[in-house]
Amino acid sequence: MKKTIITVVGKDTVGIIARVCTYLADNQINILDISQTIVQGFFNMMMIEDMNLTKKDFGVIVDELAKLGEEIGVVIKCQKEEIFDQMHRI
């Protein structure tokens, strides 16, 4: 399974989750886990996804999510799970 981690941070507004989830569904990216909080008007979300079925290259998805974030006024980052695994190896 090709897992990725998506983080979304910015000022809270209506439709952030809907727009991100619609993009993922349209690209055959399955959400495995999601956590979302709002702290003093600021939106923060972390998602873990399975990207096995998507036809797009990882770099394209990263770029498109960043552009989507700009459109809706948040910062969206997409990283491969391996990065986090490597950070915790000694």
Predicted segments with their positions:
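A conserved regulatory-domain signal marking ACT and ACT-like small-molecule sensing domains
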Residues: 1-90
